[in-house]
Each structure stands twice: as C-alpha cells, then as structure tokens.
Amino acid sequence: MTCEHWRGDSAELKNERSRAITLLCLMDWQAFWLTFRLAVIVTAVLLALGLPIAYWIAFSRWRWKFLCEAVVALPIVLPPTVLGFYVLIALGARSPLGRWWQSITGHTLAFTFEGLVIGSVIYSLPFAVQPFAASFSAVDRRLLNASAVLGVSKFRTFWRVIIPLSFSGLVTGGALTFAHTIGEFGVVLMVGGNIPGVTRTLSINIFDQVQDLNYSAANTTSLVLLLIAFVLLSVVYSFNRRVWSLWPRP
C-alpha cells in the first residue's frame, strides 16, 4: 500500500495516526535499511578485529605501545574529511588494495558498499578498541596469574576469565560502534559518495533533504537517528549500572 493511499484516507483517521503515517511516508526506508546493514556489519567486524587489538594494548609490555594507541585514537581527533580522503586514496584504482580488488570483482572499492564498510571500520575503530582495552585492563591480574599457575592456556583464559569479566566493556564498545556508524557523515560522503541504494545512508539523506529545503523529511530522519542513539545509550548505561550493582564490594 502506497503513501499516497494513506494520505488519501488520513482525513477519516485520528490525528495521531495521520501524523504517524505522514512521518513514515517521509522516511527514506532504503537509506534506513542500508544504514542498519552497514552498522551491523561494521560492529561485527570490529568485534572480530577489536578484541585482539585491545588485548594486545591491555597486556603488552612493549615500550612503544603508546604509538599504537595513538594510531587507534587518530579517528577521534582527525577531521572526517581528512580521514575519508586518505581512505579514498587507499581504496582507489591506483592503490595495491584497489588493484587487487578490481582484478577480482572488476570494479574498485571506492564508491561501493564494500568500500563504505572499510571506511566505517577505520573511522569507528577507537569506539570499539578503547572500551575493550579499558575493560581488559581492569581485570584482576591475580586471576590471570592463578590461571597461568594452573596451566590453563592464554587462549582459554581469555575466553573463560577475561571475556566474562569484561562483558560490560564489550557491550559498551559494541553499542558505541553501532551508534557511531549510524551517524557517520564525512567519511561516508568522501568514501562512498551519494549513490541511492548503494552508499546513501541516513546521514547523507538528511543532508540532501536540507539542501532541498525539505525540513519535514529531514526532521523525521533526524528524530529516528536521535531515538536510536538515545535508546542504545540508555540500554548501555542501564546494563552497566546493573552489572556494577552486582559486583562484589571489597
């Protein structure tokens, strides 16, 4: 059933339902589901990549470790256009990665959904790694030493001791990554452009609607992003508060 049909019948409906239907009709659902898919994929990738990186940061004794921490934190302070520009160059047809990808698929990574995933992973890296590393560092070293004395492997200790004790940090990192990916704009625009159904996310859609002076549609999409971010952060804070309330006091 089309939006036009709903608008035609809205005079016979209650005002509240009419306004809700109008808001739904103003929403770009193609951009919504593309953004949601991007956020899910980026969060999953950063869970896989972020855990080993965070583990190394938390437990490594290398004297130059701070350089790696600085590299991980760079996306927080760099302007999105700067980061997006260098990611775009790295994914272009003249780069080794771009040539390799083009030899396999026949097209470059730039201005594709796959390229968007890579750019978003880089841009959201600190939002996953830093909470992970902080939660790993907070694990009582006596438990790790006891595990080593008992002959338990580091791999098993990681999954049986560190991960359960760091679960609140993992939830925080995952939620921040998801929320940050949904709201990305600069890197998304630089790396993916504005291709409907391919790289146009909700943030790009808002930009388009504002340029077209379509403030009603821009407001609807902005409210959706605001609601998603608020709900995610509320769930994270509620979860962490419950975890800390159950944590034994010294």
Q: Over which residues does each language-model region extend?
A:
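Transmembrane alpha-helices
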Residues: 44, 129-132, 136, 140, ...
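Membrane-interfacial helix termini and adjacent extracytoplasmic/periplasmic loops
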Residues: 22-23, 84-121, 191-195
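Interhelical loop and adjacent transmembrane-helix boundary motif
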Residues: 24-30, 191-230, 234
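Faces of alpha-helical transmembrane segments in polytopic inner-membrane proteins
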Residues: 49, 71-80, 107-133, 164-168, ...
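Non-cytoplasmic
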Residues: 93, 170-207
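Transmembrane alpha-helix signature in integral membrane proteins
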Residues: 26-57, 70
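C-terminal transmembrane helix and the adjacent membrane-cytosol boundary/short C-terminal tail
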Residues: 64, 133-144, 148-149, 219-250
